[in-house]
A protein has these predicted regions:
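A cross-kingdom feature that marks ATP-driven nucleic-acid transaction machinery
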Residues: 4-14, 19-20, 24-164
Length: 164
């Protein structure tokens, strides 16, 4: 595309204001470094996700329900919530890092998988380094089980556990 980055940024801001998309920013303890990294973009209407990859559509679905859940906690309970993703210089990435703002509750990391049952190596990597609760949501999963400190849960069970 022959569009300036400034124009693309403006278009994204317009789409956000129209509630067509939302951004998930990178988590980093150093805010200056987090600002330099690109956000992930998700659609509020998953019907707009035009991808042949069912995993990408599923990740968008989980992101949508997670952001709704966190907004619900902010609006009804007054909690200070946050939703991010994590990616380091070595290329390790986890789909979501979030805090619910509930007193005494640790932040959580979440990896979304369409069919894989074994624990994601990146989820294990960040769980050990950040000492957070870790969950892997599996679309085609049919039972909940533990992989060490990581809980693998079917999508239907995870979505049912959210407030809205």
């Amino acid at each position: 595309l022959e569009i300036s980055p400034k124009t693309v940024k403006r278009y994204i801001e317009i789409l956000e204001r129209m509630y067509l998309i939302f951004r998930v920013t990178p988590f980093h303890k150093n805010i200056a470094r987090a600002i330099l990294k690109e956000p992930k973009i998700y659609f509020f209407d998953i019907g707009l996700v035009q991808s042949e990859d069912p995993g990408a559509r599923f990740e968008n679905l989980i992101a949508l329900h997670l952001i709704k859940h966190l907004h619900y906690l902010e609006d009804t309970k007054g909690y200070s919530t946050a939703l991010h993703y994590i990616r380091d210089k070595q290329g390790h990435e986890v789909d979501f890092y979030y805090t619910t703002g509930k007193k005494g509750e640790k932040p959580s990391i979440l990896e979304v998988k369409y069919s894989e049952q074994s624990a994601s190596k990146n989820l294990v990597y960040f769980q050990e380094r950040l000492n957070v609760s870790a969950t892997q949501v599996v679309y085609k999963g049919n039972r909940t089980f533990q992989h060490g400190a990581i809980r693998s849960i079917p999508a239907i069970d995870f979505l049912s556990s959210l407030a809205c």
